[in-house]
Regions:
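Short, conserved active-site loops that position catalytic residues or coordinate cofactors/metal ions
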Residues: 2, 7-9, 33-56
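Active-site-proximal beta-strand elements of phosphoester/diester hydrolases
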Residues: 2-14, 96, 109-112
């Protein structure tokens, strides 16, 4: 049995609706190439910054991003791994990946456990843990 996997690279911008449109376009392009399993990148709907994680976070049950991906999986009869989005759960925000089946149902979910923190004195400082919680 062969499975065709499509890995989508997306230029994320500071506009959630545009990012969802870009993801949709990439998914439909992969579908046209007969992909069985489509993979979106980490934080595909949100610029990669702590401030934006807060601004762009969505609750799983009220998520325009996840609703769109579910619809696309169902309409195109394909599995989609929604790389990750900033997911709000209670007072916490997680970097969460979702796997959708061909019916558009969430069949798996993973909250990132090992957050990316870097502090190189005088060069670079970025700590996901300043905003995100470990799953």
């Amino acid at each position: 049995m062969k499975i065709k996997i499509a890995l989508c690279q997306i230029n994320v911008v500071d506009n959630k609706e545009k990012n969802i449109e870009n993801a949709t376009s990439m998914i439909l392009k992969a579908v046209k190439q007969n992909a069985d399993f489509i993979v979106l990148p980490e934080m595909f709907n949100c610029p990669y910054s702590n401030e934006k994680f807060i601004e762009y976070c969505e609750e799983e049950t009220h998520s325009p991003t996840l609703s769109k991906i579910a619809k696309l999986a169902n309409e195109n009869n394909t599995y989609i791994l929604a790389g990750s989005i900033p997911e709000k759960e209670g007072s916490k925000i997680f970097n969460t990946s979702y796997l959708f089946d061909k019916n558009g149902e969430i069949i798996a979910k993973h909250q990132k456990m090992h957050l990316f923190d870097i502090d190189v004195k005088g060069k670079i400082y970025f700590k996901e843990s300043d905003t995100l919680s470990s799953g």
